[in-house]
UniProtKB/Swiss-Prot annotation:
Reaction catalysis annotation: O-phospho-L-seryl-[protein] + H2O = L-seryl-[protein] + phosphate; O-phospho-L-threonyl-[protein] + H2O = L-threonyl-[protein] + phosphate
Native species: Oryza sativa subsp. japonica
Protein name stated in the entry: Serine/threonine-protein phosphatase PP1
Active-site residue numbers: H136 (proton donor)
GO MF terms held by the record: metal ion binding; protein serine/threonine phosphatase activity
InterPro entries: Calcineurin-like_PHP_ApaH, Metallo-depent_PP-like, PP1_catalytic_subunit, Ser/Thr-sp_prot-phosphatase, STPPase_N
PROSITE patterns named in the record: SER_THR_PHOSPHATASE
Keywords from the UniProt entry: Hydrolase, Manganese, Metal-binding, Protein phosphatase
Lineage: superkingdom: Eukaryota
Cofactor: Mn(2+)
EC nos: 3.1.3.16
UniProt remark on cofactor binding: Binds 2 manganese ions per subunit.
Length: 322
């Protein structure tokens, strides 16, 4: 399979382009198989995905500055067959530009396939495919919620540690055309200027408090004014007043975040000044939520593509919703 222009040199920097294409081919082969079919890459292939993508993350800013058109996806949580459906619907890279808002691993059954495909696309299309850090891209969290166990069962703990080194270098926010600010969690009382995001150190673990913690953990709160307690026991909740204040101060139009299951896959807050996007339908098999992806066109108009929750045991359908 011939590599796309630029994939060999630029995209495959530090990784053999033929090998990279073969890894992507194997990961996509299961599209036609039963959902849940595993793809067994070798340990050495996965290590390469981690180390090469890590260098790319570090070479790009911690606050990514991106341009529309772009498609934005929320939490995936190891639901690999749903990730493949998102791409089938939005177009497989490089057909569309993508920004993912974090939480690739844990809870679902196929965290390894999920993160490997995302890292492979990052290496192949470094200027068109972007990944932010979620609160689950952190050793103390994914040690508990499934990723560690999956790595240990299918490979070994050493490989989990290689992923940790990679996750510690993920960028934490993105700004689209200077108007849409994206992160996994939300706002922080410690965020007064966007440059503060740029100067957060990497590699780094996620601390228990402070700006980085809040960007990955905070939530909007319907009955909150200002800053409130967060039921998660980490970070804060913030009211609609804080959203309006922040947008006005920084001349922004919208905050786009993930981090919470929402029934329709997307949900507005603060008079459409903030949107939550969640891309794992039937989350954990326990919710009947839809998944969504937000498309931002050149004029910054946002529309939503919905992955409906499956009929029990059935395939699920897609519908386009404004």
């Amino acid at each position: 399979m011939a590599a796309a222009p630029g994939a060999g040199g630029q995209g495959g920097g530090g990784m053999d382009a033929v090998l990279l294409d073969d890894i992507i081919r194997r990961l996509l082969e299961v599209r036609t198989a039963r959902p849940g079919k595993q793809v067994q890459l070798s340990e050495s292939e996965i290590r390469q995905l981690c180390t090469v993508s890590r260098e790319i993350f570090l070479s790009q800013p911690n606050l990514l500055e991106l341009e529309a058109p772009i498609k934005i996806c929320g939490d995936i949580h190891g639901q690999y067959s749903d990730l493949l459906r998102l791409f089938e619907y939005g177009g497989f890279p490089p057909e569309a530009n993508y920004l993912f808002l974090g939480d690739y691993v844990d809870r679902g059954k196929q965290s390894l396939e999920t993160i490997c495909l995302l890292l492979a696309y990052k290496i192949k299309y470094p200027e068109n495919f972007f990944l932010l850090r979620g609160n689950h891209e952190c050793a103390s969290i994914n040690r508990i919620y499934g990723f560690y166990d999956e790595c240990k069962r299918r490979f070994n703990v050493r490989l989990w540690k290689v992923f940790t080194d990679c996750f510690n270098c993920l960028p934490v926010a993105a700004l689209i055309d200077d108007k849409i600010l994206c992160m996994h969690g939300g706002l922080s009382p410690d965020l007064t200027h966007l440059d503060e995001i740029k100067s957060l150190p990497r590699p780094t673990d996620v601390p228990d408090t402070g700006l980085l913690c809040d960007l990955l953990w905070s939530d909007p709160g319907k009955d909150v004014q200002g800053w409130g307690m967060n039921d998660r026991g980490v970070s804060y909740t913030f009211g609609a007043d804080k959203v309006s204040e922040f947008l006005e101060k920084h001349d922004l139009d919208l905050i786009c975040r993930a981090h919470q299951v929402v029934e329709d896959g997307y949900e507005f807050f603060a008079d459409r000044q903030l949107v939550t996007i969640f891309s794992a339908p039937n989350y954990c098999g326990e919710f009947d939520n839809a998944g969504a992806m937000m498309s931002v066109d050149e004029t910054l108009m946002c529309s939503f593509q919905i992955l409906k929750p499956a009929e029990r045991k059935g395939k699920f359908m897609a519908s386009n919703k404004m």
